[in-house]
């Protein structure tokens, strides 16, 4: 059965309210929020917005719905400006799960590391393979920020070292660190769902005994590590810089991403006095800041 899709443009201030209105008043069977500028959402700090500044609200309707009536209802809600931009499309019914699965393939990062969907055969059984189900967690390796961190980890000698994954999300970086030789990894995240995802993915990869996960309030006192990786956002990286630097042993190595190239210098300023920084690495408008703690 075909479906009708209506896409509206909104701001982060009214997108969720518009989504509620579409579900409750116009008969939408589902509503999805997409970034109009193709930027991913990262876990925000408490009080920060969860949506983008320029958000597309996409509503799905059964094919026999009257789109002109739906658009009148949207207009009558006064939640969008007069003459609001919209797009109406017919969407063919598909095996969405199969199509979704077909979009994910094993990906190589650095020399040794592969991230593989669990339903696919690993390309190189002798490589370091992390099995992950895209969609069951927050990070899958497809975004440049995750790729930058994975490539950095692959380039380190992690043998016997302790690693902290600050903002662990799916646990992809934590699991990769263990598979690359780390003795122990501690994952920290403000979202309990992220901790569950990390545990599930660690178990899927057989490394659950080497990974511990904590909410910030529960992390061990005096926690320090040889290596810290933080793939979050520029704002938290600046605001939490004393905490992040405090997690590093003297001589320890730090990598940070989730940073747009235009934000790199403003983040680096918070770390330059305490770390010997490497050249900034860039990928598709995103960047990685890394360095070694002085002392």
UniProtKB/Swiss-Prot annotation:
Coiled coil (residue ranges): none
GO MF terms, alphabetically ordered: protein-lysine N-methyltransferase activity
EC number: 2.1.1.-
Function: Methylates ribosomal protein L11.
Binding site for S-adenosyl-L-methionine: 146, 167, 189, 231
Lineage: Bacteria, Pseudomonadati, Pseudomonadota, Gammaproteobacteria, Vibrionales
Major enzyme class: transferase
Membership in a protein family: Belongs to the methyltransferase superfamily. PrmA family.
Gene Ontology BP annotations: methylation
Entry GO terms, CC: cytosol
Cellular compartment(s): Cytoplasm
Keywords from the UniProt entry: Cytoplasm, Methyltransferase, S-adenosyl-L-methionine, Transferase
Organism: Vibrio cholerae serotype O1 (strain ATCC 39315 / El Tor Inaba N16961)
Keyword Cytoplasm included in the entry's annotation: yes
Main location: cytoplasm
Name of the protein: Ribosomal protein L11 methyltransferase
Catalyzed reactions per annotation: L-lysyl-[protein] + 3 S-adenosyl-L-methionine = N(6),N(6),N(6)-trimethyl-L-lysyl-[protein] + 3 S-adenosyl-L-homocysteine + 3 H(+)
Keyword Transferase annotated: yes
């Amino acid at each position: 059965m075909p479906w009708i899709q209506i896409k509206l443009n909104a701001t982060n201030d009214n997108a969720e309210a518009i989504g509620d209105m579409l579900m409750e008043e116009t008969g939408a069977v589902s509503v999805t929020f997409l970034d109009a500028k193709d930027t991913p959402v990262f876990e925000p700090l408490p009080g920060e917005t969860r949506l983008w500044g320029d958000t597309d609200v996409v509503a799905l309707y059964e094919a026999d719905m009257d789109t002109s009536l739906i658009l009148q209802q949207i207009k009558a809600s006064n939640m969008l400006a007069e003459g609001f931009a919209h797009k109406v499309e017919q969407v063919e019914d598909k095996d969405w799960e199969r199509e979704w699965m077909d979009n994910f393939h094993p990906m190589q990062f650095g020399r040794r590391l592969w991230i593989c969907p669990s339903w696919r055969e690993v390309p190189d059984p002798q490589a370091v393979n992390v099995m992950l189900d895209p969609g069951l967690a927050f990070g899958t390796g497809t975004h440049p920020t995750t790729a930058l961190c994975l490539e950095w980890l692959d380039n380190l000698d992690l043998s016997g070292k302790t690693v902290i994954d600050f903002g662990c999300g799916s646990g992809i970086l934590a699991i990769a660190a263990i598979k690359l030789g780390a003795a122990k990894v501690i994952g920290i995240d403000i979202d309990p769902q992220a901790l569950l995802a990390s545990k599930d993915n660690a178990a899927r990869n057989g490394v659950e005994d080497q990974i511990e996960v904590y909410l910030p309030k529960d992390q061990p006192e005096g926690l320090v590590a040889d290596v810290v990786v933080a793939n979050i956002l520029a704002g938290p990286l600046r605001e939490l810089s004393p905490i992040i630097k405090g997690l590093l042993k003297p001589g320890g190595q730090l990598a940070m991403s989730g940073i747009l190239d235009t934000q790199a210098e403003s983040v680096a300023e918070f770390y330059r006095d305490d770390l010997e920084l490497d050249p900034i690495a860039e990928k598709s408008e995103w960047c990685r800041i890394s360095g070694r703690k002085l002392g």
